[in-house]
């Protein structure tokens, strides 16, 4: 049964923390600190409160959170020690059903990424609509982000973590972000007008016109 904001706002601190358990991978203090700002008028307000807690915690805490996440199709998946949430997400993306070639490719990408940045590659594998990216999309994102700057990539990992949390929170509260999905669909339709090399990937480029 889906949670409600009324239940969250009226619960004891311990009960409320239990309701939000599992949002941030092995890192309950973010939600716990955000809960001190109750009552929340909307889920958006709760999400924002959690992002501010992490932003204010500083770089060391942020990197520790990133490192608390498992690799995609990594050792934790093989040994079946993923959290229930991560298991569901990686399964939906097909990562538990890789071919030997796909598995070897992802393992090598994991190793290369970790060697360069010092933390695991983080991607919200359920994607912009929450239904799951496919393995090709995941590998393409992996390869693209391997070329990023460490400072930018740290922020990209945090952005994906917040997206993962948003999806998990929506699941807990039975929320379907229909307006956000509609905006995404519009972007997909517009992407056919992108420049060559981008349209094929479903990516939208923007051209700014200036006075002649």
Regions found by a protein language model. Name each.
Residues 27-28, 34, 121, 190:
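Residue-level signal for inorganic ion chemistry
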Residues 13-17:
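An amphipathic alpha-helix signature
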Residues 25, 147, 166, 170, ...:
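Generic secondary-structure signature for well-ordered alpha-helical cores
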């Amino acid at each position: 049964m889906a949670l409600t904001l009324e239940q969250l706002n009226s619960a004891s601190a311990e009960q409320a923390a239990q309701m939000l358990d599992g949002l941030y991978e092995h890192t309950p203090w973010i939600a716990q600190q955000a809960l001190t700002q109750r009552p929340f008028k909307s889920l958006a307000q709760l999400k924002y409160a959690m992002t501010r807690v992490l932003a204010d915690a500083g770089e060391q805490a942020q990197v520790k959170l990133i490192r608390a996440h498992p690799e995609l199709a990594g050792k934790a998946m093989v040994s079946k020690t993923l959290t229930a949430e991560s298991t569901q997400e990686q399964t939906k993306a097909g990562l538990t059903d890789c071919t030997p070639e796909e598995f070897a490719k992802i393992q090598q990408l994991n190793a290369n990424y970790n060697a360069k940045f010092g933390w695991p590659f983080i991607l919200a594998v359920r994607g912009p609509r929450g239904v799951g990216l496919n393995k090709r999309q995941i590998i393409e994102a992996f390869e693209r982000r391997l070329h990023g700057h460490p400072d930018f990539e740290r922020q990209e990992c945090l952005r994906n973590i917040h997206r993962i949390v948003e999806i998990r929170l929506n699941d807990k509260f039975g929320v379907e972000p229909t307006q956000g999905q509609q905006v995404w669909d519009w972007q997909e339709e517009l992407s056919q007008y992108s420049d060559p090399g981008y349209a094929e990937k479903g990516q939208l480029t923007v051209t700014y016109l200036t006075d002649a």
